[in-house]
Design a protein with these regions (language model features):
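N-terminal secretory signal peptides that target proteins for export/translocation
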Residues: 1-2
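Acidic, polar-rich low-complexity tracts and alpha-helical solenoid repeat scaffolds
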Residues: 5-6, 15-165
C-alpha cells in the first residue's frame, strides 16, 4: 500500500515538474519560430491555450497563433479563425482589440498579401489568396480588383489564356 502511494506521489511530482509554464511555452514558441519550426511553435501555443486559458499570456498566445497561420503558413482560414478566437475569448485585451481591427480590414489584408506573394514568386499562394477573397467576399468593393489580379496571374505567370479570360 505504501509503495502504491509512494509511486503515485512520485508520478504526480514528475508530471508536475515536467509540465511547462505559460512563460516557458511562449518562449519555446518564439525559439521554434526563429528556428523555422512553425508546426512546433503552433503546438506550443495550443498547449498554452489548453493548459492556461486564463493566464495573462493566453491572449498573446492566441493572437500569435493567428499571426503564424497568416504570415508563416499563409493559411487564411485558420488565421481568420484564430483572430475570431482572440476577439471572442480575449476581446478586452490589447490583442483582442488588434484582432478586431484586423478582422475589419481582412479583405484589404488578403489583397495586399496576394500582391506580396506574387512579388516573391509565390504564385500558387497568391492565387489561393485571391480565390479566397473572391469566394468569401464576393460583394466587397475590392473583389473586382482581386478578379483582375487573378486573371493577370493566369495570363502572365501561367500563360493559361482560356482560364485568364
Amino acid at each position: 500500500m505504501k509503495t502504491k502511494l509512494l509511486l503515485s506521489l512520485l508520478g504526480l511530482f514528475l508530471i508536475t515538474a515536467c509540465s511547462k509554464s505559460a512563460d516557458e511555452l511562449i518562449e519555446l514558441s518564439s525559439e521554434n519560430l526563429k528556428n523555422e519550426k512553425t508546426d512546433q511553435a503552433i503546438k506550443d501555443l495550443e498547449t498554452l491555450l489548453t493548459k492556461y486559458p486564463e493566464d495573462s499570456l493566453a491572449s498573446k498566445a492566441q493572437y500569435k497563433l493567428a499571426s503564424i497561420h497568416l504570415n508563416w503558413k499563409n493559411d487564411l482560414t485558420k488565421g481568420y479563425t484564430s483572430l475570431q478566437n482572440t476577439v471572442s475569448h480575449y476581446g478586452r485585451s490589447i490583442q483582442g482589440t488588434q484582432a478586431q481591427k484586423e478582422i475589419d480590414q481582412f479583405p484589404e489584408y488578403i489583397l495586399n498579401k496576394a500582391e506580396s506573394l506574387r512579388k516573391r514568386k509565390m504564385v500558387k499562394e497568391a492565387v489561393e489568396h485571391l480565390m479566397y477573397m473572391i469566394e468569401k467576399y464576393s460583394q466587397h468593393e475590392l473583389t473586382p480588383k482581386s478578379q483582375y489580379m487573378l486573371g493577370d496571374l493566369y495570363m502572365n505567370e501561367f500563360r493559361d489564356f482560356p482560364t485568364a479570360i
